[in-house]
Amino acid sequence: MKLSFGEKVRNLREDKDLNQTQLANKINMTQRKISYIECGKCEPSIDDIISFCKFFKVSSDYLIGLKEIKE
């Protein structure tokens, strides 16, 4: 089963034992935006994708669904 962008972000966040507010503070994003991205109500911007990739140390290809391996 292929995970959505938001599901991957949620899994990565939970792997680091962070709540949405903690992640928001670390990547300079609002908690509401993270919530909307995780549940699929909002598409991330390029800058958002870059922020998630840098913080979680994963490739953009993984997050956007081009590869199934985090790398």
Per-segment meaning from a language model:
Residues N28, D47-Y62:
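DNA major-groove recognition helix of helix-turn-helix/homeodomain DNA-binding modules
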Residues D15, K54, Y62-E71:
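Short, charged recognition helix plus adjacent turn
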Residues E7, D17-L18, P44-D47:
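Residue-level signal for the short linker/turn that defines the boundary of a DNA-recognition helix
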